[in-house]
Amino acid sequence: MKAKDFDYYLPEELIAQHPLEKRDECRLMVLDKETGHVEHKVFKDILDYLNKGDCLVLNDTRVMPARLIGEKEETKGKMEFLLLKRTDKDTWETLVKPGKRAKIGSRFIFGQGELKAEVIGMAEEGSRIVKFEYDGIFEEVLDRLGQMPLPPYITEKLEDKEKYQTVYSKESGSAAAPTAGLHFTEELLNKIKEKGIKIVFLTLHVGLGTFRPVKEGEIENHIMHSEYYCISKETADIINTTKEAGGRVIAVGTTSCRTLETLGSKHGKIIEDSGWTNIFMYPGYEFKVTDALITNFHLPQSTLIMLVSALSERERVLNAYEIAVREKYRFFSFGDAMFVK
């Protein structure tokens, strides 16, 4: 299959630039994965589509303020650092701009000098391995000095950092939010529990590769980025029990879905586990664990729209996207939601 088979027309004004004031009042498109039938709802109506005995799987990762603005020690030239993933205690794979100023041995200063960095190696696709020096706890220093690494298509400034976190975020480590989870409020989660639906958590730290378009002509040749995941025994047991009892396992977001399918493909069921996954799902993939998916509207030709197309069917998904454009849904990270059931 070709990447262009997953293309669609999107007017720029439909790319949401800011989150809604009330998380659960965004629009919700409900797509029947077998028939392609579409319904238009509000997100809090998701409650009507969840049944007692179902299990909702959420990703509790927390976005790091991973964008650092600093200067080169020698020249005082302005530099931008974007932390991608931790490779050791104080060492990170990092995107550095402008890259030509970031040679091995180059040193940089952030804030009033409370954070320093040195490039100690080169990594794939032009990123650098950077070692940081600081006093105290790195996460606290980052909280003071760092900015939220918003996707490139969001050009407006985010006034409140917490708007780019889910209400249940806990485990810091992501370079982007698991955006399907942004629509849930504490109140909605409580109502879901009261209805007899199990809510469980896993962790997958979202990397910037999630925004990378598929450049290869044939999608089968695309090399997927790796992301770290972790799942507890308690979560694994509840998911397996749900499947055995005939309930649905509903992934909240493509990140939860990727973790579930990684484990299903490796072990045939969900077990306590942690590691790295580069699973790539596109039409023809047979789902092992995920029965339904809550997700946002994704970029044309992205691996994420391919994943959704694998769960339903390419034509059905592209037709639903065409309807969403016509009905002026809001797209991408701060946009509206879709429930593929």
From Swiss-Prot:
Pathway as given in its UniProt record: tRNA modification; tRNA-queuosine biosynthesis
The protein's Enzyme Commission number: 2.4.99.17
Keyword Hydrolase: no
SUPFAM superfamilies (UniProt xref): QueA-like
Keyword Cytoplasm tagged: yes
Listed Pfam families: Queuosine_synth
GO cellular component annotations of the record: cytoplasm
Keyword field: Cytoplasm, Queuosine biosynthesis, S-adenosyl-L-methionine, Transferase
Transmembrane segments: none
Catalytic activity reported: 7-aminomethyl-7-carbaguanosine(34) in tRNA + S-adenosyl-L-methionine = epoxyqueuosine(34) in tRNA + adenine + L-methionine + 2 H(+)
Enzyme superclass (EC): transferase
Subcellular location: Cytoplasm
Molecular function GO terms recorded: S-adenosylmethionine:tRNA ribosyltransferase-isomerase activity
Family matches, as InterPro entries: QueA, QueA_dom1, QueA_dom2, QueA_sf
Single Gene Ontology BP annotation: tRNA wobble guanine modification
Function: Transfers and isomerizes the ribose moiety from AdoMet to the 7-aminomethyl group of 7-deazaguanine (preQ1-tRNA) to give epoxyqueuosine (oQ-tRNA).
Complexes and interactors: Monomer.
Entry similarity comment: Belongs to the QueA family.
UniProt xrefs under NCBIfam families: PRK00147.1, queA
Protein name: S-adenosylmethionine:tRNA ribosyltransferase-isomerase
Biological source species: Clostridium tetani (strain Massachusetts / E88)
Classification lineage: Bacteria, Bacillati, Bacillota, Clostridia, Eubacteriales
